[in-house]
Structure formats: structure tokens, C-alpha cells
From Swiss-Prot:
The lineage of its organism: Eukaryota, Sar, Stramenopiles, Ochrophyta, Bacillariophyta. This is Ribulose bisphosphate carboxylase small subunit. The keyword rRNA-binding does not apply. One of its GO terms (molecular function) is ribulose-bisphosphate carboxylase activity. Pfam families: RuBisCO_small. Its main location: plastid. GO terms for cellular component: chloroplast. Gene3D superfamilies: Ribulose bisphosphate carboxylase, small subunit. InterPro entries: RuBisCO_ssu (IPR024681), RuBisCO_ssu_dom (IPR000894), RuBisCO_ssu_sf (IPR036385). Heterohexadecamer of 8 large and 8 small subunits. Belongs to the RuBisCO small chain family. The keyword Thylakoid does not apply. It is found in: Plastid, Chloroplast. One of its GO terms (biological process) is reductive pentose-phosphate cycle.
Length: 139
């Protein structure tokens, strides 16, 4: 199952050249970049681990790509995404986010149904990877 979160998630994986073009676009807009990673990409897990420090005031694409390269080396079996943050007045939010690296095997999710009193039914999204392995060794 292919995880689809963020921009470009329904497209094939971006090449490094395509990632560089997206970074250039973000830098041209004046947005700060950062790299995040996780081994638990649950749809409600919006807070991934920050790789290094946010790249404020970086105007060099190579610096951002270096941080991405280091994250790929260290977190090869996890998910890595790039975020762009617009700090301008009135926005002050993440304006672009896209996955740049993913594990070779993505086990996916399943829906667990629980029946309660009075025909009350709840559904919970569960991860196959969390059931099988402890945190840090899921992929």
C-alpha cells in the first residue's frame, strides 16, 4: 500500500532533480524549509521528527539537498518529507509538504470495527507495521 500524504503524493516518487526544482520554488517564495522523518506515518500523525534545525534564511538549494541526503542516510527505512513554512504575516503556516523518501515495503493500514452499546459502532485506523515491530524497527 502506497502512503499518500502531502503534495504530489499520487504521482510517482520525485527524482532529486524534481525535488531541487520544488526547493528552488520555495526559496524563491521566501519560505523556510525543513526535513522531517518518521517510521509511523499514521494519517493523524501530523508531527514527524524534525531532522536537524529548520533551514531559515537558507538561499542555497545545495544546503537543503545536503540535509536531505544526510536524513536519507540515517533514516533509510523510514519516511522523509520536506516542508515549506511561510512566516509572512497572515499566513504563518506550513504551505507545502511532500514525501521525498519512503521504505521499499509499505505494509499499510487496516480498519478495526468495534461495536458498543446501543448499536454504537466506532472505527479505528490501525497500522500493520506497529503491530509487528517496536518503534524504530518497523521497516
Amino acid at each position: 500500500m502506497r502512503l499518500t500524504q502531502g503534495c504530489f503524493s499520487f504521482l510517482p516518487d520525485l527524482t532529486d532533480q524534481q525535488i531541487e526544482k520544488q526547493i528552488a520554488y520555495c526559496i524563491d517564495k521566501g519560505w523556510a524549509m525543513n526535513v522531517e522523518w518518521t517510521d509511523d506515518p499514521h494519517p493523524r500523525n501530523s508531527y514527524w521528527e524534525l531532522w536537524g534545525l529548520p533551514l531559515f534564511d537558507i538561499k542555497d538549494i545545495a544546503s537543503v539537498m545536503f540535509e536531505l541526503s544526510e536524513a536519507r542516510k540515517s533514516c533509510a527505512n523510514g519516511y522523509i518529507r520536506m516542508n515549506a513554512f511561510d512566516a509572512s504575516y497572515g499566513t504563518e503556516s506550513c504551505v507545502m509538504s511532500f514525501i521525498v523518501s519512503r521504505p521499499s515495503n509499505e505494509p499499510g493500514f487496516y480498519l478495526e470495527r468495534t461495536e458498543g452499546a446501543g448499536r454504537f459502532i466506532t472505527y479505528t485506523i490501525k497500522r500493520y507495521s506497529v503491530q509487528a515491530n517496536a518503534e524504530g524497527s518497523r521497516y
